[in-house]
């Protein structure tokens, strides 16, 4: 994603460790990044975001997320994390500085989870007016949470249609399309003649979000 303040392309993601061609269970995980300089047309070697508590954030990464860049150049980077002993993920938004070269931790907001499956993970963030919205993956359903400052969020609620029925998304990330004509959610769901597709991950759907409800 283009970082306007620095004039650099900042790619963010997470590390994944393998052994014998398989992902290592209960592995260390970090948010990773690399920077592209359009003047030299080169990428930097990838680096990782240093977090304040290596035990608490033993498995912490910005995998499959959408971040938000602020006018002052700071970055709101959603991550999900757990310690080695925990079974469920928590989601938080990390405020980072970025000087065009190094991504550095400043602070993080409240920590969101639910007692269902692996918790809340693969978060994506957007802003609409004076509110920030965070969409979250869970094993059973998609969730959304709202904030006034981009760091501290209300209790997550399940994604619902305007008639109160469940969206039908589960165990798959969702993403935002923030447009001048409104806010939209890109998602997958069951119940669309797609039972033959793994976790109903095709086709992709897009729906307008009512930010008031």
Model-derived regions: residue spans:
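Alpha-helical scaffolding within the catalytic cores
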Residues: 170-174
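Beta-rich carbohydrate-recognition and catalytic domains
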Residues: 1-60, 68-122, 126-168, 180-182, ...
């Amino acid at each position: 994603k283009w970082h306007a303040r620095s004039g650099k392309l900042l790619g963010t993601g997470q590390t994944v460790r393998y052994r014998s061609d398989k992902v290592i269970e209960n592995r260390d995980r970090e948010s990773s990044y690399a920077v592209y300089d359009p003047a030299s047309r080169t990428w930097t070697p990838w680096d990782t975001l240093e977090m304040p508590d290596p035990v608490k954030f033993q498995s912490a990464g910005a995998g499959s997320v959408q971040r938000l860049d602020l006018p002052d150049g700071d970055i709101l980077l959603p991550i999900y994390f757990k310690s080695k002993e925990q079974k469920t993920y928590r989601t938080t938004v990390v405020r980072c500085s970025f000087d065009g070269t190094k991504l550095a931790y400043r602070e993080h907001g409240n920590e969101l989870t639910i007692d269902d499956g692996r918790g809340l993970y693969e978060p994506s963030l957007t802003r609409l007016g004076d509110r920030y919205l965070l969409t979250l993956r869970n094993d059973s359903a998609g969730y959304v949470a709202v904030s006034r400052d981009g760091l501290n969020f209300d209790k997550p609620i399940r994604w619902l249609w305007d008639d109160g029925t469940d969206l039908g998304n589960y165990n798959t990330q969702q993403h935002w399309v923030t447009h001048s004509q409104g806010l939209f959610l890109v998602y997958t769901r069951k119940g669309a003649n797609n039972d033959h597709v793994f976790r109903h991950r095709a086709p992709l759907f897009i729906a307008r979000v009512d930010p008031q409800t």
